[in-house]
Amino acid sequence: MEHLFINTDIPPEVNAEFRVYSDDEMKRLNAEITQMDVQIARCLLIHQMLGTRISDTLTLRPDCLTRENGQDMIEIYQVKTKRYKKPISKELAKLLQSSIEYTQEKFGDTEYIFVNEKEPDRPMQYMAIKTKVMSMIQEKQLKDDHGELFGFGTHMFRHYYGVKLTEMHLDDWTIARLLGHKRLNNVQHYRKMSNQRMADETREV
C-alpha cells in the first residue's frame, strides 16, 4: 500500500507546531467545505469524524462497513501499521454508504471509496484535495480566529479529534486505539493541547 502514494501526497504526521482548530474555526471551515465538490466534501467530513491519518481515509475500501451486535463498525487499513476496526455513528455510516454508492455509480467496482477521477484504480490524492481547499479559502477569504487566512492541513482535523477525545475523559489506551496508535506517548500531545485550549479560553474570559 505504501507504493500508492508519492512523498508529496501525504503530509508529515509530526509538525513543529502542534495546532488545533477551535470549534468556531471548524464551523466556518465546514460551512464552506460542504459547498465544494460533493465527494471531496464527503471525504473531508468523514476524515474529520474518523480522526484517521489522511492516508488511511483515502484508502478506505468499499467493504469497510460492518455491523457487530447492532453497532456500526469500520475497518481501516493503515499504511504505516496494520488494519483495525472501530465503532462509528449511524450518521457516519450513512455518509460512508453514500460515498461508496457515488463511486460505484460513476466508476463501477473500485478498490477504494475515494478515487482519482483520471485513474480510478488509484486513491484520491491528498495534494489535489489540499489545492482545491486552499483555492476555496482564497476565493472566500476565509479567516481564522486571529483574522488571518486559514491555514490548511488534514493533520489539524486529527488534532481536533484527538483533543475532543481527551475532553471526554477517556483513558489513554482507548484514545490510542480510536486514533490507531500502537503506543501511548502520542496521546500526551493531545492532552497537552487540550490543557492549552482551556488556558486560552480562561484568559479570554
Give the role of each language-model region.
Residues 78-82, 179-204:
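Catalytic-site neighborhood detector that most strongly recognizes the C-terminal catalytic loop/helix
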Residues 57-58, 162, 169-181:
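Active-site-proximal segment of tyrosine recombinases
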Residues 47-68:
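Short, charged phosphate-coordinating catalytic segments
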Residues 68, 77-123, 132-136:
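Basic, alpha-helical nucleic-acid-contacting "clamp/cap" segments
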